[in-house]
Regions:
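A short, N-terminal "cap"/entry segment at the start of jelly-roll beta-barrel domains
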Residues: 1-35, 51, 117-151
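A generic "binding-loop/recognition-motif" signal
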Residues: 19, 56-57, 75, 91-92, ...
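Short, conserved beta-strand element in jelly-roll/cupin
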Residues: 35, 40-45, 54-70, 108-110
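Structural motif
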Residues: 47, 60, 67-69, 76, ...
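Short beta-strand His + acidic residue motifs that chelate non-heme Fe in jelly-roll/DSBH
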Residues: 50-52, 70-71, 87, 93-100
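Short acidic-glycine-tyrosine-enriched beta hairpin
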Residues: 74-89
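C-terminal structural segments of small proteins and small subunits
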Residues: 98, 108-115
Length: 151
């Protein structure tokens, strides 16, 4: 039997002001499922973000605490604690914390494995919204964070 304890899983810190703990289905994670991946993310207040990106896997974000702005394709909405959003494969999406408290979120995607946008963000090579072939963000959306802001 494998039991994963979130408190003991290493944190990945990303430039867009968030940290992630993968639990299932990713390289080096305690539960080696292949069919799906799952983990938790905390977005810092006032703009912490999972920046505009797409991926081959279908995915769900479940908001556990806080409130933010979710963009999926050409749509933009507020999302809050207790709500989940489906992210279809290859569709660009972005989640931004618009609140003054941390936003806690669980992600689940299938199949499992690491996704390219993590490495792109860490390497500073994440495609920029609106620069071909990457589509523009929906009108009025929070700007995409492609590097850690200087505060």
């Amino acid at each position: 039997m494998i039991i994963a304890d979130l408190r003991t899983i290493a944190v990945r810190t990303f430039p867009a002001r968030r940290w992630t703990r993968g639990m299932v289905g990713q390289a080096g994670q305690p539960i080696p499922a292949k069919g799906f991946a799952m983990g938790v993310v905390v977005l810092e207040p006032n703009g912490g973000q999972v920046p505009w990106h797409n991926q081959e896997q279908e995915e769900v974000y479940m908001i556990l605490q806080g409130e933010g702005e979710i963009c999926v394709g050409s749509e933009k909405q507020t999302i809050k604690e207790g709500q989940a959003v489906f992210l279809p494969p290859t569709v660009f999406h972005q989640l931004t914390n618009t609140g003054t408290e941390p936003l806690h979120m669980m992600y689940i995607y299938c199949p499992g494995g690491d996704v390219a946008h993590w490495r792109q963000e860490l390497d500073g090579t994440l495609p920029v919204a609106g620069v071909s072939p990457t589509p523009h963000l929906p009108a009025g959306a929070q700007p995409q964070c492609t590097k850690k802001p200087s505060i």
